[in-house]
Curated annotation (Swiss-Prot):
Keywords: Cell outer membrane, Lipoprotein, Membrane, Palmitate, Signal. Coiled coil: none annotated. This is Outer membrane protein assembly factor BamC. Residues 1-19 form the signal peptide. It comes from the Bacteria. It is a lipid-anchor. One of its GO terms (biological process) is protein insertion into membrane. A lipid is attached at C20 (N-palmitoyl cysteine). Belongs to the BamC family.
Length: 339
């Protein structure tokens, strides 16, 4: 199940969940029938006089007063997991509530700020708000897994205990088709996890956006020189980490006349077809055209820590000569600077 989109009607937030096909009842209930509910009670065995019974406790049914649904009331859907998208955070689930624990207060504060941002962007109405607590109004969930429209209210708060700092989400109100009801343990756990995941996915999105922004800033200032790899062979050296350079390759190589056909980050290879740019390109970058024939080439990128090595092979897998690599250095530098 995934979050697909959000609708806002007046002051009521409506969150839409999508699921796989089939009816809601089929997704929630076990297949076949529920004839076992009509099973008559067991009667104790009557042993022949003088017989000595042998008891094996392996399959004893535990005795006790157990509470919970039976038959078509039992929800067979797997528990909704809390997405672990916040580095260093540990999710604790207790009594249907979710607490994300962090080791530092600033980390918990960042999660709190993310939650407030998510609430504002999704226009979730609030009933109460303090510096460390918010109580939401009704949030409606339209889910393909449900026969009814689910409504829920939440209490989100910052907590602290034993030098740990947490962000806690508690489901405090439940209704179905507008009628307030007592929430089941299963639904409390499930819809607490849904709301928690709205926060964790937003946190992850913000972190990725910030990483991309930093990478873009770093790539603007990449010194490009000739050098040698660990084996002493001539290569182009980009003075930036491998991961940073890799993110920018889809933009940099096409500007040099290379159409990317295949990429494999784990192997550090990019297969691309080269067609010489027009005269206008060379005039803009202020570099003379390189003597590279049109065709398919493979770029080989090596992780050297805070630097990245770049080599190029032709369609036969043979490295291009050192002179050609030297010609490519000012071109690559000009494209990076232009970016």
């Amino acid at each position: 199940m995934k979050f697909s989109r959000q609708l806002v009607l007046g002051s009521l937030a409506v969150l839409v969940l999508s699921a796989c096909s089939s009816s809601p009842t089929q997704r929630r209930q076990a297949k076949d029938d529920f004839d076992y509910l009509e099973t008559t009670e067991f009667k104790p065995w009557v042993l022949p006089q003088g017989a000595t019974p042998q008891f094996y406790p392996n399959y004893d049914i535990p005795q006790g007063a157990f509470h919970g649904g039976v038959g078509n009331v039992v929800d067979i859907r797997p528990p909704q997991q809390v997405l672990e998208l916040i580095p260093g955070a540990r999710a604790e689930r207790q009594n249907g509530e979710v607490t994300l624990w962090m080791l530092r207060q600033d980390e918990a504060q960042k999660v709190w700020d993310t939650a407030l941002k998510m609430i504002a962007e999704r226009k979730i109405p609030l009933r109460k708000q303090t510096d460390s607590m918010v109580e939401t109004d009704w949030v409606d969930w339209v889910s393909e897994d449900e026969d009814v429209t689910i409504g829920s209210r939440y209490l989100m708060s910052m907590v602290e205990t034993n030098n740990r700092y947490g962000f806690k989400i508690s489901l405090i109100g439940w209704r179905e088709n507008g009628q307030v009801q007592t929430v089941s343990t299963t639904n409390k756990e499930r819809y607490n996890a849904f709301m928690t995941n709205l926060v964790t996915t937003r946190y992850d999105s913000d972190v990725r956006a910030e990483a991309a922004r930093r990478a873009q800033e770093l790539v603007k200032q990449i010194p490009i020189t000739m050098g040698s790899d660990r084996s002493g062979f001539p290569v182009i050296i980009a003075r930036t980490p491998y991961d940073v350079l890799w993110q920018r390759l889809p933009e940099l190589l096409p500007k040099m006349g290379f159409t990317i056909e295949e990429r494999n980050q784990s192997q550090g290879t990019v297969k691309a077809k080269y067609a010489a740019p027009d005269d206008e390109f060379w005039q803009q970058v202020g570099v003379k055209p390189i003597e590279l024939k049109s065709g398919t080439y493979t770029f080989l990128f090596g992780d050297l820590g805070n630097r990245t090595s770049i080599n190029v092979t032709d369609s036969a897998g043979k490295p291009v000569n050192e002179a050609l690599l030297k010609e490519m250095v000012p071109v690559l530098s000009a494209v990076v600077d232009k970016k």
